[in-house]
């Protein structure tokens, strides 16, 4: 992984990151036998999984001459947040996060949920909001489930569950992993 300590966050150049990801994917495709070990590694290393493979979407980037889809590269505080959430989950501890704007908390939670869904059998991750459209509105990038579906769509096929098909496994308010039984579900306060 590129050295994020020297990455220019104010004027990002994602080309080296995309090149590194492409090279990683080419190595994986040249030697598919490494996939089980890679998945075993990522099952215990969510920060590395996010930094190595996941992307985010921000249409405001276009105004700055940056692609709307960019590699998801975690700031140090974001990496600490991921580790905090995973530690609470593993320890079966309650926790609370006060969500601020434009710090990526929604995308972080989407990334963590995606990681759990991919690598931990039988997990059920829930997302909720006071309105259903904030949780899942097909085609709306503001909804959490759009972000999850887009995250999955941007992953290499090798990292997706065997047999996964968005139409069959990601209907409204639910995303099912056909390989390991994990599910991401949505709830809303709408009556």
Task: Describe each model-derived feature in a short phrase.
Residues 2-191:
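Phosphate/NTP-binding elements of NTP-utilizing enzymes
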């Amino acid at each position: 992984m590129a050295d994020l300590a020297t990455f220019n966050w104010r004027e990002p150049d994602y080309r080296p990151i995309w090149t590194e990801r492409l090279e990683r994917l080419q190595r994986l495709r040249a030697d598919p036998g490494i996939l089980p070990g890679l998945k075993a590694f990522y099952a215990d290393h969510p920060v590395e999984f996010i930094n190595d493979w996941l992307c985010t979407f921000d249409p405001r980037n276009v105004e700055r001459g940056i692609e709307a889809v960019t590699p998801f590269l975690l700031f140090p505080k974001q990496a600490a947040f991921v580790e905090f959430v995973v530690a609470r989950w593993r320890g079966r501890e309650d926790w609370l996060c006060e969500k601020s704007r434009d710090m990526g908390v929604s995308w972080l939670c989407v990334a963590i949920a995606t990681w759990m869904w991919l690598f931990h059998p039988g997990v059920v991750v829930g997302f909720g909001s006071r309105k259903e459209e904030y949780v899942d509105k097909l085609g709306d990038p503001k909804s959490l489930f759009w972000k999850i579906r887009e995250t999955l769509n941007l992953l290499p096929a090798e990292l997706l569950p065997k047999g996964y098909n968005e139409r069959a496994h990601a209907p409204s308010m639910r995303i099912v992993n056909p390989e390991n039984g994990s599910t991401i579900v949505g709830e809303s306060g709408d009556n």
